[in-house]
Amino acid sequence: EGYIGRAFDLSRVFEYKWTVNLKFLPEPIFVSKTTAAVLLAGHAGVLALFILTRWLHAQGGGLAGVWLLLRTAPPADAPPLSPYHMVRMLFVSNFIGVVFARTLHYQFYSWYFHTLPFLLWATPLPLVARLAIFAAIEYAFNVFPATTASSGILAAAHTLLFVGLFVGPAEGERLCRHDDCGSRRKLE
């Protein structure tokens, strides 16, 4: 089997004792093929949702934005993607993969830890909420072995960050703190 076949092998079973993110599920549910399929479908669906509603906002959003992106030569008046937007797309897409992972082990924290400050500050959440989310994620990955509570805290923190990223500004609406924001939305 090739990489793609093995990467999406729904018959593979992960060891329940090592999971950090889904320890709040009973083991039979954790190892079920239905759970694996739901997580994979959720991952694909949320990526599509972000593509259609958040990431291609400056290109017109929706399927029109996808069409513009897929064209061989974008029109001269097509707005360029900013470096901020590119980094945000990459970090958010990685985070979506983390949220919908069938299992996260302790070493996976290093896979996305360095993106958390950027992601947290890309949300409209208050400072105290950002710091609480960061502390909750840090706590969850420092409990060994993972417990139902630490896993639930991680899921709650991921959910709050995810919602903050979704309701936050789309490309072309980047939050800024200065009076001269151009087309960007100002922080309240």
Q: Model segments located where?
A:
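Juxtamembrane membrane-water interface segments that cap and precede transmembrane helices
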Residues: 13-34
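Multi-pass membrane glycosyltransferase architecture that uses lipid-linked
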Residues: 1-13, 33-188
